[in-house]
Regions:
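Serine-dependent carboxylesterase/thioesterase catalytic core
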Residues: 2-15, 20-111, 123-124
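C-terminal catalytic-base region of ester-bond hydrolases, centering on the histidine
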Residues: 107-162
C-alpha cells in the first residue's frame, strides 16, 4: 500500500497462488505476465521462495524488463530443515537441490538484489544474506512475522530504486 501511495504501480501475479510450482516454472509464468502487460523497469518485491523466483527472472531477463529485486526472508542457500519435510515443494528448498545450487552459483545479478531478513528465521536457519547484494537485517523474529514488521516495510520502501 505504501509503494502504491508513492506512485509505484503494483502488479500481482495471481497465477502463482500458493506457489507450489517449481522456481523455473514460476519464473516462466511471471515472464509471460511481464510481456503480456508490457512492463519494463520492474521492481520485484518477493517473500521467501518468491525471492528465488525473482533471482531467476533477473538471470534470464533477456528483454531487460526487471530492474531490481527486493527479497524478504529468502532462502538463498536453501534450508536444511527442508530435508525433514516430505513432498517436492518444500524438498526443492534443500541446500543441495539443483535449482538452489544453480541460483547460488550465479552471482552476476546479486548487485541488483536487496535482501531483507529477520534476526531469527526459524524456517531458514542458514540465514538470508546474499554475497554481493545489499543485505539488511531487521530486528524482527520469524519467517512470516517479518512481513508485517514496520522496519521491514520501511526498508522495502527505501530500497525501491536504490
Amino acid at each position: 500500500e505504501r509503494l502504491h501511495a508513492q506512485g509505484h504501480p503494483i502488479h500481482v501475479v495471481d497465477a502463482l497462488a500458493i506457489n507450489t510450482i517449481s522456481v523455473a516454472d514460476a519464473a516462466s509464468l511471471v515472464t509471460d505476465v511481464l510481456r503480456e502487460r508490457e512492463l519494463r523497469g520492474v521492481v520485484i518485491v518477493a517473500h521467501s521462495k518468491g525471492g528465488l523466483i525473482g533471482k531467476r527472472l533477473l538471470i534470464e531477463d533477456v528483454d531487460g524488463r526487471v530492474a531490481q529485486l527486493i527479497a524478504i526472508a529468502t532462502p538463498w542457500h536453501g534450508s536444511s530443515l527442508a530435508r525433514y519435510v516430505p513432498g517436492r515443494v518444500i524438498g526443492a528448498l534443500r541446500p543441495e537441490d539443483a535449482a538452489i545450487v544453480a541460483l547460488e552459483a550465479n552471482t552476476e545479478v546479486n548487485a541488483r538484489i536487496t535482501s531483507i531478513y529477520p534476526a531469527l528465521d526459524q524456517h531458514v536457519p542458514e540465514g538470508s544474506q546474499l554475497e554481493g547484494a545489499t543485505n539488511i537485517e531487521v530486528a524482527a523474529v520469524g519467517h512470516f512475522r517479518v512481513l508485517s514488521d514496520p522496519e521491514v516495510l520501511d526498508a522495502v520502501v527505501a530500497a525501491v530504486g536504490r
